[in-house]
């Protein structure tokens, strides 16, 4: 698995790159071209834009599909979503996370979407342990909100990769 130090470095990089600077995705792409290639999977920051992108065919979602063709297929996905508001830090730890439609005022077709990826309780426990001394609690109720599934359904439409979601 991902070492504690590596996970903290990756989370710090995401925070620094996107919240402390004025960088955009093109800037990040230019920087990442200079990173040494390793056997580790890349860390991606992907905003979903309008929730309608989950069901529309446009250049925005084609970009997601292109990304999935350019990186190795992961064994599991840890998604940090800005749509899961919690008091504390939680990780989804269920076998079958539900698809959450946490929005309103959109066409029924968007509410009909189901992204039925499996969860990974073992990875959830490992993630909680790696982030120690931060208390990370296991959650068995949340699921995958649209910040996760609206992007993942374009990256991996077969939903054949286990996904856990982390709230920070």
Give the role of each language-model region.
Residues 1, 23:
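Short regulatory "switch" loops immediately downstream of catalytic or recognition motifs
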């Amino acid at each position: 698995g991902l070492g504690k130090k590596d996970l903290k470095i990756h989370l710090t990089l995401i925070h620094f790159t996107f919240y402390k600077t004025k960088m955009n995705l093109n800037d990040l792409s230019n920087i990442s071209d200079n990173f040494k290639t390793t056997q580790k999977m890349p860390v991606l920051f992907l905003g979903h834009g309008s929730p309608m992108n989950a069901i529309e065919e446009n250049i925005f979602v084609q970009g997601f599909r292109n990304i999935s063709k350019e990186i190795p297929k992961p064994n599991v996905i840890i998604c940090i979503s800005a749509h899961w508001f919690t008091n504390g830090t939680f990780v989804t730890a269920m076998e079958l996370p539900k698809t959450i439609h946490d929005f309103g005022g959109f066409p029924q077709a968007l509410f009909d979407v189901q992204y039925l990826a499996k969860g990974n309780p073992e990875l959830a426990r490992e993630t909680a342990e790696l982030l120690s001394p931060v208390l990370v609690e296991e959650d068995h109720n949340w699921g995958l909100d649209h910040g996760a599934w609206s992007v993942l359904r374009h990256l991996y439409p077969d939903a054949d990769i286990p996904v856990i979601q982390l709230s920070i």
